Amino acid sequence: MEIELLSKARPSGLRAPGRARSKSSINNKRSYATLQGITGNKSATRRLCSIVALALAVAACRGETGNADSASADMVQLAAGKKSKTIRPAPAPDPAPAPAPAVDTSSSSLEGAAPIASNFDPAIELAATSIPPSAAPDVVGAFRFICLPGQIKSDDPIVYPGQPGRSHLHQFFGNDTADANSTYASLRGAGNSSCMSPVNRSAYWIPAILNGKGSVVRPDYVTIYYKRRPLSDPIVSDPAHPQYQGKGIKLPNGLKFIFGRDMLNLSQPQTGAISFSCDGPTAVPQSSYKNFEEAQAGCAVGNRIGARISAPDCWDGKNLDSPDHRSHVAYGGYGGWGYYKCPTTHPYVIPAFTMGVWFTQAQGEVYSFVSDSMDTSAGHKRGDTFHADFFMAWDPAVHDMWEKNCIDKMLNCSAGDLGNGKQIKQTWPHSWTASPRLVAIPS
């Protein structure tokens, strides 16, 4: 698996030389692959080894080409140059908003909700860096960053808006004010972010991970990897192209959805190309498992278990939400026509992301998602109910940067690199190991 020795130290905000480039492979089965490698300077490596040992992470890629590129490069760069960043307090939060309606009204624009500027200067959250390399021979632009675990709440602003404590327990990432009352306006108006910086006030959440001993396991980190073909690519711009996928557009403001196992309708097939992996000093290379039970059986104590899931890449162009919180987005497919494309009901191609949730396996623990207890179907396994929620609330200017540069110029951007000589600063307190690792299940 992806175990990379930290290479060269660098000044704060600058990228380490030798950044891994993405590699391409065609996979019509949409399977995961992780192809990477970083060769570091040996003397610099020895110096860094006294501070950190190994940085590891996997960001598996799901898409029309089966492209793969790990977010381990993010951690190499952050560990080499983000240690001494000044941590600034979040802007003062706005008053608690009124409960949101269950479903948003339709969007009148392909850009989604009207953009809401940050209540701080986003320029102070950016650092100078070099321009990243092209992602070629890959066919998608890549934008990656690392998130750290945030709040743990029995809230779900998508399924149970305005109803605190109504949902099963969730582990949140991103905006640290996200709760049952969150709306696009409230997320944009307040909060720090465990996804590097408050320029990304989006909220991401998954069912909490339990250890079988009455505690919640907090992830060490989460990798996020956005990707899409550039808008100049005729496959997403020219309807006359023989392999036209759909019209490429930016990620709509305020878009929210759920993907993975449908907890409101467990009879539905699982979505999100879910897989589990093992990474660490004794991990089996390129391991892949179907659930926690298989992963624990094949992953020795002391290694990290990773749960990976990919978001939809097609949108209906009208709705920022839907009654089931899923129908307004969709996954492309190959069908009988032999090439990847979006359904005619969802003709717009949006930047999709793959999320990898990584935590350290300890002796005597038995892992499950809190939602697994809701699945009473015959033969169900621990981990079968993996799903994730997303509520888009990026700073409009910074969002525009990574879309126009990393995605549309088909660059290989890691560690919050925006592809324009700027990089998002790591202002959230950073560590590669969750501390505390375990917390009590809230009463």
Task: Give the residues covered by each predicted segment.
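Intrinsic, low-complexity polybasic segments
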Residues: 8-17
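Intrinsically disordered, low-complexity segments enriched in serine/threonine/proline/glycine
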Residues: 18-24, 45
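Bacterial signal peptide processing site
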Residues: 62-65
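Primary mode marks residue(s) on the alpha4-beta5-alpha5 output face of response regulator receiver
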Residues: 103-166, 171-309, 316-443
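Polycationic, low-complexity disordered segments in secreted or periplasmic proteins
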Residues: 79-91
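C-terminal motif of bacterial Sec signal peptides marking the signal peptidase cleavage site
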Residues: 58-60
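Bacterial N-terminal signal peptides that target proteins for export
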Residues: 29-49
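Intrinsically disordered, low-complexity proline-rich regions
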Residues: 88-100
